[in-house]
Amino acid sequence: MNKEEFINKIHGGLIISCQALPGEPLYTEEGGIMPLMAKAAQEAGATGLRANSVRDIKQIKKVVDLPMIGIIKRDYPPEKPYITPTMKEVDELMETGVEVIALDCTLRPRHDGKTVAEFIKEIKAKYPNQLLMADTSNFEEAKNAYEAGVDFVGTTLSGYTEESPKTDHPDFDLIKALVDDGLPVIAEGKIHTPEQLKQVIDINPAGIVVGGAITRPLQIAKTFTSVFEK
């Protein structure tokens, strides 16, 4: 799938992120839960999916036929980047046939010692036809990654790094600035409500991802139980 085909598939609809990490209620060693989430997302009308780990991506692809953004979350302390942070994770994801690979493109120190531009160029040299998405937290990071060769820039990490504003809502200003600059934007991060989604739609990015507000029942339940604590 090329870039234009991917945009045609996901634009005007919703990419739903289906993830569960160790320690979360929906995580199991053998998997099997995220494919059910993905089926529910597809039945609800999702136009794409975002998933974590080779296991989950392969299991989802067996039951759902939607374009997918794939990542591997792996910590390399003390460095902070953990979303597809090295070529090892890229190599593993390539075995899944996932349509887009997303990777941390913040300007924080990396485990492999490379710059973001060096990492992107290395991936593109090894896998020239693979679509890449930059997970970033601010305008500078997104612009840097796009100029280095990624196909899409995401606002995934805005609000989660020291280099971005701390808010509990989508970074509308960042999404708009990137769209206005002509970049192919996948808006993601802190979209908690349909009203916030509508605001993002009005900015008209190439794609939009919603995750926790749909597929993390612990997070969803807490929004209700916390009412009793106020």
Curated annotation (Swiss-Prot):
PANTHER family in the record: N-ACETYLMANNOSAMINE-6-PHOSPHATE 2-EPIMERASE-RELATED (PTHR36204:SF1)
Q: Name one Pfam family in it.
A: NanE
Keyword list, A-Z: Carbohydrate metabolism, Isomerase
Task: Spell out the HAMAP family in the cross-references.
Answer: ManNAc6P_epimer (MF_01235)
Q: What are the BP-aspect GO terms?
A: carbohydrate metabolic process; N-acetylmannosamine catabolic process; N-acetylneuraminate catabolic process
Protein name (record): Putative N-acetylmannosamine-6-phosphate 2-epimerase
Pathway given in the UniProt record:
Amino-sugar metabolism; N-acetylneuraminate degradation; D-fructose 6-phosphate from N-acetylneuraminate: step 3/5
One molecular function GO term is:
N-acylglucosamine-6-phosphate 2-epimerase activity
Q: What class of enzyme is it?
A: isomerase
Corresponding gene?
A: nanE
Q: What are the annotated disulfide bridges?
A: none
Keyword Glycosyltransferase appears in the UniProt entry: no
| GO cellular component assignments | cytosol
Q: Which family does it belong to?
A: Belongs to the NanE family.
| SUPFAM superfamilies reported in the protein's UniProt record | Ribulose-phoshate binding barrel
EC number(s): the record gives: 5.1.3.9
Organism, as annotated: Lactobacillus gasseri (strain ATCC 33323 / DSM 20243 / BCRC 14619 / CIP 102991 / JCM 1131 / KCTC 3163 / NCIMB 11718 / NCTC 13722 / AM63)
Q: Which reaction does it catalyse?
A: an N-acyl-D-glucosamine 6-phosphate = an N-acyl-D-mannosamine 6-phosphate
Gene3D superfamilies given in the database record = Aldolase class I
Function, as annotated, reads: Converts N-acetylmannosamine-6-phosphate (ManNAc-6-P) to N-acetylglucosamine-6-phosphate (GlcNAc-6-P).
